[in-house]
Structures are given as structure tokens and as C-alpha cells.
Amino acid sequence: MSRIDSDLQKALKKACSVEETAPKRKHVRACIVYTWDHQSSKAVFTTLKTLPLANDEVQLFKMLIVLHKIIQEGHPSALAEAIRDRDWIRSLGRVHSGGSSYSKLIREYVRYLVLKLDFHAHHRGFNNGTFEYEEYVSLVSVSDPDEGYETILDLMSLQDSLDEFSQIIFASIQSERRNTECKISALIPLIAESYGIYKFITSMLRAMHRQLNDAEGDAALQPLKERYELQHARLFEFYADCSSVKYLTTLVTIPKLPVDAPDVFLINDVDESKEIKFKKREPSVTPARTPARTPTPTPPVVAEPAISPRPVSQRTTSTPTGYLQTMPTGATTGMMIPTATGAANAIFPQATAQMQPDFWANQQAQFANEQNRLEQERVQQLQQQQAQQELFQQQLQKAQQDMMNMQLQQQNQHQNDLIALTNQYEKDQALLQQYDQRVQQLESEITTMDSTASKQLANKDEQLTALQDQLDVWERKYESLAKLYSQLRQEHLNLLPRFKKLQLKVNSAQESIQKKEQLEHKLKQKDLQMAELVKDRDRARLELERSINNAEADSAAATAAAETMTQDKMNPILDAILESGINTIQESVYNLDSPLSWSGPLTPPTFLLSLLESTSENATEFATSFNNLIVDGLAHGDQTEVIHCVSDFSTSMATLVTNSKAYAVTTLPQEQSDQILTLVKRCAREAQYFFEDLMSENLNQVGDEEKTDIVINANVDMQEKLQELSLAIEPLLNIQSVKSNKETNPHSELVATADKIVKSSEHLRVDVPKPLLSLALMIIDAVVALVKAAIQCQNEIATTTSIPLNQFYLKNSRWTEGLISAAKAVAGATNVLITTASKLITSEDNENTSPEQFIVASKEVAASTIQLVAASRVKTSIHSKAQDKLEHCSKDVTDACRSLGNHVMGMIEDDHSTSQQQQPLDFTSEHTLKTAEMEQQVEILKLEQSLSNARKRLGEIRRHAYYNQDDD
């Protein structure tokens, strides 16, 4: 590598450093001078390709700035070399595909450079990167005015692209207040290029107007004139924005345009002195001619001030880019005239041979007059623009002062509002403190009442008489105290586990007896305390409601004032819907973690897989509807579809969690059960994250494309978690030895189930005046109606599918197996209920049948009914009448089972109360009382231990029953 090439490489490295500063002018100038010295720019492009500048966004952006300046001010070979390397320049825009500010600027910069190179490749008359009017002299002999019209259109399109890119740069500068020097430096070549294009379009439109010079021609040029005026307004705003950047004004002098666009149709004597003639091209053979030797103009060396601000005296010798240079002198004009003459002779040799010698003198005079006219117009425009710029600066300062005053007023108003809200908050705190004191007083009164009641226990006979008198009064008040009783009952149920733990930790029987006596005293006194508690509660509730209403009124006023300042009303609604879905999933996860055992029917793995498919489809539909809402906008989008999808997705996920627990806990070993439940929790947690990612607080700060990406990524994560759960459940299908074929028709299975239930219940239609038997027959009738409704659902599915029903069942084999399993579960549970009722009829005095058997059988029927309804809901339509009827029949079965259970529990309580009345207790001595109490506690512990063992035994029986069912 030679020393010159080494210096070139060093200059490019320093110009494209990693610091976020503007490329230094001396390094860029070294590259430009290299192209003029060697009359070639191939080495510059080769060095740019070999240097690792594309790895860093800042270096790549600075490389594009350097490349743009080399194309503008370098040797014409730089433009030709850049046109050949358009594919390489286009590939630079795909290097960094991220969402950072520099990545977007790089893509837009590459897009603009490619458009510029395409323009130069199509219009070879522009032999340099700038758009000076003098450089287009070689195009004055274009054969067709249409080509000039097309050239103006292409230049205007390029000017629009330049304006769009400059707006993107300003937006990036405003978003990042620090380290904007590098981005500001990209505006320097854009200012020069935009002004060159503007000057050329102005001159070209005037020439076209002179050439056509009729009403029809002006009508044809009217669209170009309107677009020219629009571009003039945008260019004026662009230069005004550039003037507001102090750092940019130290680097380059901003052009000053008039407020109104110049009239390109205005013709004066100076304009008529120079016309661009458009002639029809005639095919002819070019005769041999003597090439005219024309002087080669010296390449322009455009000096630009350094990055650091310097005094004015030091910048007098340096000029900005081409648009700030003065117009060519008479000598320069004389140098360019032979070039135009040579170009004209090259294109029209026959016409040149016929021209008289004085034509060239007239042509030279016309060019000189045109140059003088353009110089005068430029000086006038600069003076007008200077005055307009000063007026604009004054208006800008006044607007800024008004804005500051308005901000101060708003700040004072906000401060006053904050003080008012603070005072209101202090008042509310004082009021709440008064309520706390009142509650403490009530608690002290309750303690006093407890002590008083303990003293009154001495006379039990008098107390029993008083309680008997008050019993009638409390019975009348029982209905009004039902809600309070349910709350106390819930508290009592919550205290039972703690009470059991405390019983195990009791060190002596005496302490347990004392605690029991205290509890009995409290229970006996609750009725006495209840009246005053209710009064105090009502009084406190009334005061609390009054304060809440006042607080709500204040908050409503504040909310109304805040809502008037915002237009986004849909975000809270969507957040509430998403939160409801999150709550549904959280409740299912809570039930999953609950230690209560599953008492419903056994769920087969095929049914779980069908639920997985339904959940996956609902998740995809939810993602699609949410993306559609983002694309259409909150105001014009379909919000109802999103709400339905959220409900369906959360409900299907909750159903999947519940049935997964049923299958894992009752069927699988502990290790596999924990594995399945862990995967189910991951799916539920992922669904919850899915909803949380779509909350407005997470989406307000991003654009629509990023929002759709978030939705798609969340859906992909959700599908991955569901796929993991599906892969974990599918091996369990191999464990089963399913006898029935997948082509089994669920429709025929449901019909067989209904016939079986009807035939089994025919021998029960006897006139037996037993309430249990009547309730059992009611459940059987409801189950028969349920199965018939399920058959109607299958018939409806057959009418909605375009393929035969058998093929539909074969295609959805997992759902088919789940539906068949649900039908068999209904038949089995109903058969157990019928068997229990038969034993009740055949046995004498119900020796072999207990009422508890009816409760168990009815619960099995209700659980299997729920499984059948859930399996049928998977493939039915949303507003299916048959499905609504099926769910109504399921509700009837559940109500009948609940009635049977309530009746049996009433019988048990009656028998228990009768047995207690038949065996009176002896409380004559304290020893007998304590002995009876200890015996009763021992009996309770035995029953609890028996209950625990029975539950464990029930789990083992269900697990073995599941595997035996699979073997069958």
C-alpha cells in the first residue's frame, strides 16, 4: 500500500470515528482532493468497503455523510463509481435492522442516496453531485420538451425525498437532546443539494414557459407550478428550522428564501434575453468535424468552516457549499460558453454548419445577460430573506415568551389545585381517625359486655328462661341477620383449622376445658350482643357510606375534570377486560394450588388435548382480534370481538387448569402429577403475562408496529407453553389400552346412553311414597333430558359441517374420545343412582341403603353432566340454541342433585336431633360433664382420622379405577 493510499485510509477512519461528533472537514476534504488529484474515486470506494465501518451505527451514519459529500464535491468519477456501487449502498440499509434512532436514520439516508443515484443514472447531463443550473447547459439541445418536463418531475420527486429525510433528522434531534452533533452535520449536504435543486427547477420552469408561451402550455405547466410553490413553502420551513439550530449556523450559512414563491410565469426583458430552445430531433448522419478544443474548468473546491466556532474574520475566505458561492464572473462565463457551443455542435452538426458567425456573439451576450439577471435576483432574494428571517426570529421570541407565561399560569393553577386536594386529604384522614376511635370504643364496650355476661353465668336457670322468652324475637329477626350470619359462618369455618391446630398443641386438659368454656360462653352471648352490634354496625355503615359518598363525589368531580383533558377513553375499558381475564386465570390457579381433592368425574387425556386445541385457537383468535384493533384504531376498531376473545381465552384456560388438576391428582402418580401441574401453571402464568403485556401502560409508549410485534411474540410464547403441555400429555395416551375405535360415533353413543337410562329406570316407576325415591326419579328424568339435548347438539353439528359426520368425528378424534368418555360417565353415574334407588325399593326398612349413598350418587351425576356439557361446548357455535338447551338441562340436573342432597342432610339432622333427645345428658356433676366432653373429643378425633384415611383410600380407588377403565 502506497503512502497516498495509507493517508486516504487514515483520513476515512478519522472522518468515520465512533464518537458522536460531526466528521471533521479536513478529513473529508482530504478524500475529495484525492479524487481530483487522481481523477478517480475507485480507491475511495474500495477503502470504504474494506474498512469495518458497518459494525457500529454511528460509524456507518458518518460514512454515509462522507460518501454524500464526496459525491457532491468530488471528481465526476465519484458519481459514476457510486452509480455502479448502488447495490452495495442499498445493502448498508439492511445491516442494522433494530429500532434505534440511528438505525432508522441510516435506512432513510441509504434510501435517499439510492434515489439520488438513480436520478443521475437516468439523467446523464448532471455530471456532478450538485444541481447547479450552469452544469445543465449541455441539455439545452434536448430534442423534446417532454424530456424537460420529465426532468423537472424527477427533480421534484427527489426534492420531496430530501424534505422527508430532513424531517426525520429533525424529529430524531428533538427526541434526543444530547449528542446531536453528528445528526446535525448530516443536514449540511442536504442544505446545499436542496438549494441547488430549487434554483435549477426555478430556471427550468421559466425556460419551459418561454418556450411554450401560450395558454395551453401554461395549463400544462400549472401542476408543476403548484407543486413548485408547495416545495418552496416546505423549503422555507426547512431553512427556518435549520436557522433555529445554533450549532448548524456556525457551520454553514443558511440560504434565505422569500416567503412567497417567485412567479415562474412572469416574463421580463432580462428573462427573454436567454431562452432554452426545444427542437424536434431529426434523424441525420453526423458529418465529420474538427473537435473544438475547449478549456477544462478547474474543479470547484468548496471550503466549509470547521466544526468548532471561529470568529467572522477567520471565515471570510471559506464559503459554504455551491449554493452560497457567487455567480460566475465574466471570465468564468466565457469559459463555459465554448463548452455549451461544443455540446450544441456535437448534437446538431448540420445546424451549426449553417449558422452565421454573429450567432455565437448573440448567444454569448444572452448568457451574460442571464447571469447578471440571476445575480440581481439572488441579491434581492437574500435581502428579502434576511428581513423575513429577522421578523421570524422576533415572532419566535415573542411566541416563546407567551408560552413561558402560559406555563407559569398553568403551574400556579396546578399548585393551587394540589393545595386544595391536600387539605381535603387531611380532612378525610381526620374523619377516618374519628371512625377508628369509635371502633375502639365499640370494642371496649364489647369487652365490657363479655365480662358482664361472664358474671351472669352463675344463675343458669334464670338465663335459660330469659333466652327462651327471647327466642321468638330472634326468630323474627333471623331473616334480616342472614347476611351477617353467613359472614360469621365463613369466619367460623376459617377458624376451624386454627382451632384444630390449637387442640393438638394443648399441654393440659384443663386449659382446653377453659378455652372450650370461653367459646361456649361467647357463643351463648352472641345472640345478646348481636342486636347492639347490628345497631352499631348500621350506624357506622351509614356514616361510612355518607363519607364514602362525599369522597366519591369529590373524586368524581376530579375525575370529570381530568377526563375533559384526555381523549383516550378506551384504554381503561380494555384494561378492565384484560384484568377480568387475569382474575379468571388467577382464580383457576388458586383452585389448582388448593389442597382440596377433586370430587368430580375422571377426565381423560383426550379431553385435555381437545381443551388444549380450543385454548390454542382462542389465543390465536385473541391475538388476531387485538392486532386488528391496533391497526384499525381504538375508536374505529371492533372492541366487542376483543372482549369476546378475552372471555373465551380466559375461560378456556381456566377450564384447562381445572380439568388438568382433575386428571393429574386422581389418575397419575405423584411425580407425573407434579410435572403436569407445573406445566399447567406455566401455561396459566404465560396467559396472565399475555394479558399483562397488552395493558395500556405497557403499550402507550410504543408504536403500532411494535404493539403488533408484542402481541405476536406473546402469542408465540403462549403457543410454545401449550405445545410443551401437549407433548407432556400425549405420551399418556399410549398408556391407555382403548378398546373403542376412534371412528366410534358419539351420536350413537349418546343415543345408547339415553336408551340405557330409560330402560334401567322403567322398573322404578312404582308408586312408592318415599321422598328419596321421588327425588332420585327427578334426577333420572333430568339426565334423560340432558342426553337428548346432547343428541340435538350433535345433530346441529352435523348440519353445520360440510363433510359427513363420521369423517368429522374421525378428523377430531381427540374431541370425539372426550365426548364419548363424558357420555359413558353420565351413563355410569346414572346407573349407580338407579341401583341405589332399586336397593331402596327392594330392601326392607332400608337396611342395605343409606341416605349418604344418594348424596354420593347425585354428586357423580352432576359432575359427569358438567363434563358432557363442556365437551359438547367445544365444537358448537357461539349462539347455538341446542347448546343453550343443553346447559339449561345441565342446570336442572344440578338443581335436582342439590335438592336430593339437602333433603338427605335434613333427614340426617332430624335423626341426629331425635337420637339426642332420646339420650338425655347428665350434667349434675362436674366430673360427669368433663368426662362426657373428653369422650366427645376423642370421638371427634377418631372420626377425623377415619375421614382422612377414607379420603386417601378414595384417591387410590379412583386412580386404580382409571387404569382399570383404560385396560378395559
Curated annotation (Swiss-Prot):
Residues 717-965 form the I/LWEQ domain. One of its GO terms (cellular component) is plasma membrane. One of its GO terms (molecular function) is phosphatidylinositol-3,4-bisphosphate binding. Pfam families: ANTH, I_LWEQ. CDD domains: ANTH_N_Sla2p. The keyword Lipid biosynthesis does not apply. It comes from the Eukaryota. Keywords: Actin-binding, Cell membrane, Cytoplasm, Cytoskeleton, Membrane, Phosphoprotein, Transmembrane, Transmembrane helix. Residues 280-324 are annotated as: Disordered. The chain crosses the membrane at residues 772-791. InterPro entries: ANTH_dom (IPR011417), ENTH (IPR013809), ENTH_VHS (IPR008942), I/LWEQ_dom_sf (IPR035964), ILWEQ_dom (IPR002558), Sla2_fam (IPR030224). PROSITE patterns: ENTH (PS50942), I_LWEQ (PS50945). The modification Phosphothreonine is found at T294, T298. GO terms for biological process: actin cortical patch assembly; actin filament organization; clathrin coat assembly; endocytosis; negative regulation of Arp2/3 complex-mediated actin nucleation. The modification Phosphoserine is found at S308, S555. Required for cellular morphogenesis and polarization of the cortical cytoskeleton. It might act in concert with proteins such as CDC42 and CDC43 to limit the region of cortical patch formation to the cortex of the bud. Required for the accumulation and/or maintenance of plasma membrane H(+)-ATPase on the cell surface. This is Protein SLA2. It comes from Saccharomyces cerevisiae (strain ATCC 204508 / S288c) (Baker's yeast). The gene is SLA2.
